[in-house]
């Protein structure tokens, strides 16, 4: 959608709808355990009449799973395949031999001291508390750590068959989320020397589904929850025609020609939480009037919304943060696209929810300014990015980090929110969900320039740590405790391959459950030649007892 068409796309919002999100306080967990409780995907809930508990947060989710499909098992959490390298522009003078090595070295336990673990946290102010926690959890001074990841070495011998030097731009694709880039981003080398790279990011590589997900999708249609790609065929559909990569290599939309009105709510205060006095979750509720046919409202930081299209009323609410809580001191924003809202007022309440009547003393500063959507979203994005970094969702503050995050945030809003003219239910409350932008899976490409001498060769190698596909521990399925890894031979690549081979470094840690590579550990067959007419190879393994 062109940005100057946006104002014409403002549509009617449902007459009355309420969505609330609980403010859950969590104890900080070890980094290795942070996402190990993803088994919470086993839970689903309905909140109130006409309300749905949105499973938000953008954390990599899973499907309902299944016994399998042609070409390997269907796992509840599919990590995506290893893709082949490609060129920015096809070159008939360049051919390639590919060798991929799957190394199970991360499965070998290594000792990690409590001091080493605490020192690895990005915020120095947190380290003593983290060390105290680890000393409590591991009084022996540390623990043995291993991983279900593998090291993938994806090597390409590029041959220049022409009489002239060939300078080409190689593109290496991989699956990740923004929050997991530190773990998943490959290193690229040519003839053993590190290459300078540019990172490109694709859009959300998935879809949306109803509140009950795959368990009864035929009964519960909708677009409330994220629905991730479940197998390699999903990536084949995503990448085959090249449009997804073309978008990733292009520029992000500029929204500076869309006028908006921005309301900033800051310095919020209120009666402190006091369970005995019935003040269980001090909350500020903001109410205003609007014409639903002429106005679109985006919001950031609020954890509850109310719509009343019949009476032309909308509400937003947030829990008053206390010092020490995440987002403490951060402002809240309402961005108005179209006709301005009217009669903005607020009041404090003892808890959240739109039926609460008991009030408390509360206050805040409200400022209003006229701006454009590009500038307004940049301010919101800076706040969201800073919060995500402080909470440890980003391990490193990449030089390209914010601008990439900001571009993807705009892209996500223009594709799926009410700004698109055909938004999904997940975002119909107008909330800017920065955690979705950070957490959803997408395909990235690393770009590097290489020169291959005339009539000669160059070796380009991508090394990365690859997560497994798996079923959640609580699932009690046939694939429980099985880790899956897979690769595709040609998908998305314009290279002319003359040969592809694969090697396995099992480290004495695994037994093969299912595969189509042809490895035979017992008989020493750890290197195989691949059939390039076979589009997909898979390896499914189980850990063996080495005690």
Residue ranges and their predicted role:
Residues 1, 5, 35-40, 47, ...:
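Generic structural microfeature
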Residues 4, 22, 40-41, 59, ...:
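Intrinsic-disorder/low-complexity regions
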Residues 10, 35-61:
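Single-pass transmembrane signal-anchor helices and their membrane-water interface zones
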Residues 27-37:
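N-terminal export and membrane-targeting signals
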């Amino acid at each position: 959608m062109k940005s100057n068409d946006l104002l014409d796309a403002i549509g009617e919002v449902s007459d009355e709808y309420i969505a609330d999100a609980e403010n859950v306080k969590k104890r900080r967990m070890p980094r290795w355990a942070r996402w190990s409780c993803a088994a919470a995907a086993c839970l689903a809930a309905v909140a109130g009449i006409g309300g749905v508990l949105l499973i938000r947060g953008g954390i990599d989710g899973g499907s309902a799973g299944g016994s399998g499909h042609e070409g390997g098992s269907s796992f509840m959490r599919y990590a995506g395949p290893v893709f082949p390298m490609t060129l920015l522009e096809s070159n008939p003078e360049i051919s390639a031999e590919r060798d991929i090595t799957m190394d199970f070295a991360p499965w070998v336990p290594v000792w990690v001291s409590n001091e080493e673990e605490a020192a690895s946290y990005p915020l120095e102010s947190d380290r003593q508390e983290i060390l105290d926690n680890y000393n409590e959890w591991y009084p022996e001074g540390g623990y043995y750590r291993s991983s279900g990841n593998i090291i993938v070495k994806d090597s390409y011998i590029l041959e220049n068959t022409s009489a002239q030097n060939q300078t080409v731009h190689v593109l290496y694709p991989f699956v990740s989320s923004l929050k997991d880039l530190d773990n998943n981003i490959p290193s690229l080398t040519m003839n053993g020397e590190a290459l300078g790279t540019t990172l490109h990011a694709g859009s959300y590589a998935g879809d949306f589904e109803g509140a009950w997900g795959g368990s009864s999708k035929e009964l519960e249609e909708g677009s409330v929850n994220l629905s991730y790609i479940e197998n390699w065929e999903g990536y084949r559909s995503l990448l085959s025609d090249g449009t997804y990569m073309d978008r990733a290599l292009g520029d992000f939309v500029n929204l500076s020609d869309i006028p908006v009105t921005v309301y900033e709510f800051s310095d919020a205060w209120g009666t402190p939480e006091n369970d005995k006095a019935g003040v269980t979750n001090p909350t500020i509720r903001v109410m205003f009037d609007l014409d639903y046919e002429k106005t679109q409202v985006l919001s950031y930081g609020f954890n509850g919304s109310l719509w009343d299209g019949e009476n032309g009323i909308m509400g937003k609410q947030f829990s008053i943060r206390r010092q020490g809580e995440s987002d403490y001191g951060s402002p809240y924003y309402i961005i108005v696209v179209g006709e301005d809202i009217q009669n903005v007022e607020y009041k404090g309440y003892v808890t959240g929810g739109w039926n609460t009547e008991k009030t408390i003393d509360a206050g805040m500063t409200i400022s209003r300014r006229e701006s454009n959507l590009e500038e307004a979203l940049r301010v919101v994005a800076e706040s969201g990015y800073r919060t995500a970094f402080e909470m440890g969702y980003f391990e490193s503050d990449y030089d390209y980090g914010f601008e990439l995050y900001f571009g993807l945030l705009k892209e996500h809003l223009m594709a799926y929110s009410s700004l698109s003219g055909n938004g999904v239910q997940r975002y119909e409350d107008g909330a800017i969900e920065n955690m979705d932008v950070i957490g959803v899976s997408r395909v990235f490409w690393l770009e590097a320039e290489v020169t291959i001498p005339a009539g000669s060769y160059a070796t380009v190698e991508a090394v990365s740590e690859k997560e497994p596909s798996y079923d959640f521990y609580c699932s009690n399925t046939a694939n429980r405790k099985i880790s899956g890894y897979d690769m595709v031979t040609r998908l998305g690549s314009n290279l002319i391959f003359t040969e592809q081979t694969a090697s396995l470094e099992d480290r004495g840690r695994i037994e093969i459950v299912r595969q189509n590579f042809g490895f035979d550990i017992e008989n020493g067959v750890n290197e195989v030649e691949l059939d390039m007419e076979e589009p997909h190879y898979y390896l499914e393994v189980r850990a063996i007892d080495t005690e």
